[in-house]
């Protein structure tokens, strides 16, 4: 029996193994979150609630069918923070750390798993990268929790309560988990610009991409004035920053005469910036999202669909996919066959992957929304918003999550899971491995457009 199980595991592809590990993580999360000690007395808790919360926390989405503050005890909050940590940093990153502590050698198979889990394209330096990522994320969360916890002493009566809220907020923001224990997201801090600024920084650190953090760290400690940033870091940083800025301007323009009417300029500035940053995958909000106009909600859907960067805590099609699509469109419109940026020519295989990811994501969002329009009674925009939030593992909601039917919740859970592991991993999971063609047929042109 044991031998057969071992052969079955060996027969699985890296993508299938990663999916299996995340499934096991969800199972463990369900068990831990269902422990009586994890709940407050009298809390209403069902299996579907446990499963949904487990998938949401492992995928670091933040959509929830229960009120976190009213449902979970202090022990439950610690368990939730642990699951967010596990899902945010990545199973293989933490697995690498455990293997190294146990003195085990990281072999070729383990390196392949790490590559799939973190969307990396090469073996070289992968283990060292994971060690640096874990070190950086834990330090960011620690200092974020320390700063917020100390600051929260002005809000809460005891050190325990202040630092509990501070460290949970830091972990939730850095992992882009979207969970909160205030019971009202970041709305209680809508006029506290310091808390908003620190939270935005933590969201960015988690969503911009682990390789970018490592390169920035190396740059800061480098003795060379001209540090050779990789093409990935250049494209990711510019795209990520542009989306945050463009998103803030768009939200401001659409809400200036609506939800933002009559507010001070600094309130409007932080409202626009925070909501735009949260759409990268943060999931926290300083305003009731349902108060926003339909045009703004649709705009936010597009931002959530793009999501965070590859090899980060977030989901969506990813910022580099969006950037490559725009670059391909720009060069095609100018009559250029090759796509060039920063004195480099992009590989046709990467351009094809970005197109495949985008098309598959559109089909997934369309299909999930279509199913929800059949099973649910909410408006099309509300359902589309929920699906985009799940796919981008964002966690923003118009307040309909708890009202979804069991079928609707299952659909959202599937979308959250795919959003976390990534479209490419999902395709490799259900399809075959990449193979090189041994022969080619004659090429023929097809009329397009």
From Swiss-Prot:
Ranges that cross the membrane: 17-37, 46-66, 75-95, 133-153, 194-214, 235-255, 297-317, 355-375, 380-400, 411-431
Keyword RNA-binding: no
Keywords: Cell membrane, Ion transport, Membrane, Potassium, Potassium transport, Transmembrane, Transmembrane helix, Transport
GO annotation, biological process: potassium ion transmembrane transport
Protein origin, superkingdom: Bacteria
Observed effect of gene inactivation: Impaired potassium uptake.
GO cellular component: plasma membrane
Main location: membrane
GO molecular function terms listed in the Swiss-Prot or TrEMBL record: potassium ion transmembrane transporter activity
Membrane topology category: Multi-pass membrane protein
Intracellular or extracellular location(s): Cell membrane
Keyword Transmembrane helix: yes
Complexes and interactors: Homodimer. Part of the KtrCD complex formed by an octameric catalytic ring of KtrC and a membrane associated dimer of KtrD forming a potassium channel.
Stated family: Belongs to the TrkH potassium transport family. Ktr (TC 2.A.38.4) subfamily.
Function: Integral membrane subunit of the KtrCD potassium uptake transporter. The 2 major potassium transporter complexes KtrAB and KtrCD confer resistance to both suddenly imposed and prolonged osmotic stress.
Protein name stated in the entry: Ktr system potassium uptake protein D
Protein's organism: Bacillus subtilis (strain 168)
Organism lineage string: Bacteria, Bacillati, Bacillota, Bacilli, Bacillales
């Amino acid at each position: 029996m044991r031998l057969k199980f071992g052969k079955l595991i060996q027969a699985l592809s890296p993508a299938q193994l990663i999916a299996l590990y995340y499934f096991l993580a969800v199972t463990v999360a369900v068990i831990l979150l269902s422990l009586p000690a994890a709940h407050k007395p009298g809390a209403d808790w069902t299996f579907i609630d446990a499963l949904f919360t487990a998938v949401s926390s492992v995928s670091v989405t933040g959509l929830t069918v229960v009120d976190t503050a009213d449902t979970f005890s202090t022990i439950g909050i610690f368990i939730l923070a642990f699951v967010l940590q596990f899902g945010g940093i990545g199973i293989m990153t933490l697995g690498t750390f455990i293997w190294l502590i146990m003195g085990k050698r990281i072999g070729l198979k383990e390196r392949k798993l790490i590559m799939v889990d973190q969307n990396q394209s090469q073996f070289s330096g992968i283990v060292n990268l994971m060690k640096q990522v874990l070190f950086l994320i834990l330090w960011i969360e620690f200092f974020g929790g320390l700063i917020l916890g100390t600051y929260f002493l002005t809000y809460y009566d005891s050190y325990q309560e202040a630092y509990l809220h501070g460290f949970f907020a830091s972990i939730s923001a850095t992992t882009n988990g979207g969970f909160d224990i205030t019971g009202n997201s970041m709305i209680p801090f809508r006029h506290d610009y310091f808390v908003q600024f620190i939270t935005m920084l933590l969201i960015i650190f988690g969503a911009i991409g682990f390789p970018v953090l490592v390169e920035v760290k190396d740059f800061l400690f480098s003795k060379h004035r001209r540090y050779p940033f990789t093409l990935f870091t250049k494209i990711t940083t510019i795209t990520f920053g542009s989306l945050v800025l463009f998103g803030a301007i768009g939200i401001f323009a659409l809400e200036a005469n609506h939800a933002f009417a009559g507010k001070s300029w600094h309130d409007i500035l932080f409202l626009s910036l925070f909501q735009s940053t949260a759409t990268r995958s943060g999931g926290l909000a300083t305003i009731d999202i349902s108060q926003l106009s339909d045009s703004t909600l649709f705009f936010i859907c597009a931002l959530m669909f793009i999501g965070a960067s590859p090899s980060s805590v977030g989901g969506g099609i990813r910022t580099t996919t969006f950037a490559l699509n725009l670059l391909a469109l720009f060069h095609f419109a100018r009559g250029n066959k090759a796509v060039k940026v920063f004195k480099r020519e992009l590989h046709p295989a990467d351009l094809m992957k970005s197109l495949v990811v985008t098309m598959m994501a559109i089909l997934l969002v369309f299909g999930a929304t279509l199913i929800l329009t059949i099973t649910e009674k909410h408006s099309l925009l509300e359902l589309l918003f929920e699906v985009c939030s799940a796919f981008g593992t964002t966690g923003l909601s118009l307040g309909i999550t708890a009202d979804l039917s069991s079928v609707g919740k299952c659909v959202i859970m599937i979308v959250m899971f795919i959003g976390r592991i990534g479209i490419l991993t999902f395709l490799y999971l259900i399809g075959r491995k990449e193979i090189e063609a041994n022969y080619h047929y004659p090429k023929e042109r097809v009329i397009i457009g």
